[in-house]
A protein has these predicted regions:
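Bacterial N-terminal signal peptides
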Residues: 4-13
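Glycan-recognition and catalytic cores of secretory/periplasmic carbohydrate-active enzymes
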Residues: 16-423
Length: 423
């Protein structure tokens, strides 16, 4: 969503002047446009009610502050993820006003909050207004509204100051946060942030925060997640900080870093036969912290080997490669995504008329076949490159069929679903 919207907002500057279109008579708006305005109003009303109920006089969220991947600081801000996007789409000023004060309160609340049993958040879950050190699955979730805010108020001085600082954590501009190895072009740990990379084994407390009486599962799910050394494709989510810093300031160093880091990942994927590796060792080799296994790694291809979930290889890759393509127009940044999708379909299974793709890979090969075909990634690839070859598996996509004039009722049906979510 974020990459697609930014393409729409920014790509026009790179195009030749379009033909003049004269609009000189009023027409009735289509039904979907009226429904969209009503939907934005309903969201605004719901947001105001939610703010009144769950934000206190300090602009703190009414909750028990916890650290970790179960219910950490990111989950608080996920509640407000779309508010800055809704404003950018034409929503009420109240979205922006509420977000601003909630964000400021959030930064104070979780800078004050402590997780004493952790290695990196014992003196504050946030440090310098940023997560002390955690994975980009969660850091990225907590920053979505912040990143979309660039579309709302690009000249906001405090935003510019923060986005420069946050991007600098990944460019070694802060000596206390040596997250990036510029020689090997890696982020040095799955846990990284304003206090730098965690290079020692991650404990269940580093992952799950303080123990909660009667809830042992809070830590059980992380008992096999100690090895976080080296780079992981989730870290490509950090490209969004460099992207926002570059498009708002024009400073070349941010663009250079993003393209260097995303380019290194592109080259690794292509050298690995088009499969996205889920660990790059501290020596720069594929699978270097997992015995040379490209599919090793926490939140990687072989994580939790008895199931089909919690393999987050695609999330950062989709973001980082998409932003690199947006900045350059170089299709080589899209090719790793294309190749990965092709590799999955090459080993597909079919059951009861359904296509199943592998979600996991281990010593035994591909496994964990499910119906997840990564249509959202395939849709991005097609919309970025507009190559009909990328429509091979997307024939039934409702949005693309609408754009092709074959699914006129889609917008109303989609918004009906949104109205139900609000209710």
């Amino acid at each position: 969503m974020r990459i697609a919207l930014l393409f729409c907002c920014l790509a026009a500057s790179a195009l030749a002047a379009p033909p003049l279109v004269r609009i000189d008579k009023a027409t009735s708006p289509p039904d979907w446009a009226l429904a969209e305005r009503a939907l934005l109003k309903a969201y605004a009303d719901a947001a105001a009610e939610f703010t009144d109920r769950y934000i206190d006089s300090r602009n703190f969220f009414k909750c028990i502050e916890r650290w970790g991947g179960n219910d950490g600081p990111d989950d608080v801000m996920e509640t407000f993820n779309h508010w800055t996007l809704l404003y950018a789409l034409g929503g009420a000023e109240s979205f922006l006003e509420q977000y601003r004060r909630i964000w400021e309160g959030h930064l104070i609340q979780f800078t004050m909050a402590r997780a004493p049993s952790t290695q990196m958040a014992a003196n504050g879950m946030y440090y310098k207004e940023f997560p002390a050190s955690f994975d980009w699955e969660h850091t990225g979730e907590g920053l979505q509204a912040f990143l979309f805010y660039a579309l709302d108020a690009p000249a906001d001085a405090s935003y510019l100051q923060r986005v420069r600082r946050f991007a600098g954590f990944y460019m070694n501009e802060d000596p206390g946060a040596p997250n990036y190895d510029p020689k090997l072009k890696i982020i040095r740990s799955l846990h990284n942030g304003s206090r730098g990379p965690l290079l020692t084994p991650a404990t269940v407390y580093d992952w799950g925060g303080e123990a909660v009486p009667g809830n042992p599962a809070r830590h059980e799910r992380y008992k096999d997640a100690a090895n976080i050394r080296g780079d992981q494709p989730l870290n490509l989510g950090a490209c969004s900080l460099g992207f926002d810093a570059y498009v708002l300031t024009g400073e070349k160093k941010y663009r250079d870093w993003l393209l260097e880091y995303a380019g290194a990942w592109r080259d690794r994927v292509m050298a690995n036969g088009g499969n996205i590796p889920t660990n790059i060792g501290l020596d720069g080799t594929i699978g270097g912290e997992w015995g040379g296994r490209w599919y090793g790694g926490t939140f990687g291809w072989n994580f939790e080997p008895t199931g089909s979930g919690r393999n987050y290889y695609m999330r950062g890759a989709r973001t980082g490669f998409g932003e690199a393509f947006l900045l350059t127009g170089d299709p080589s940044f899209v090719e790793p995504l294309r190749r990965q999708i092709a590799n999955l379909y090459a080993v597909r299974q079919e059951k009861d008329g359904r296509i199943l793709l592998p979600q996991k890979h281990g010593d035994q090969g591909w496994y964990g076949f499910t119906g997840n075909q990564y249509f959202e990634v395939q849709r991005d690839i097609y919309l970025w490159l507009m190559d009909p070859a990328d429509l091979k598996w997307l024939g039934g996509d409702p949005w693309l069929r609408f754009l092709d004039g074959k699914n006129p009722g889609y917008p109303i049906r989609a918004m009906e679903t949104d109205f139900e979510q609000i209710r």
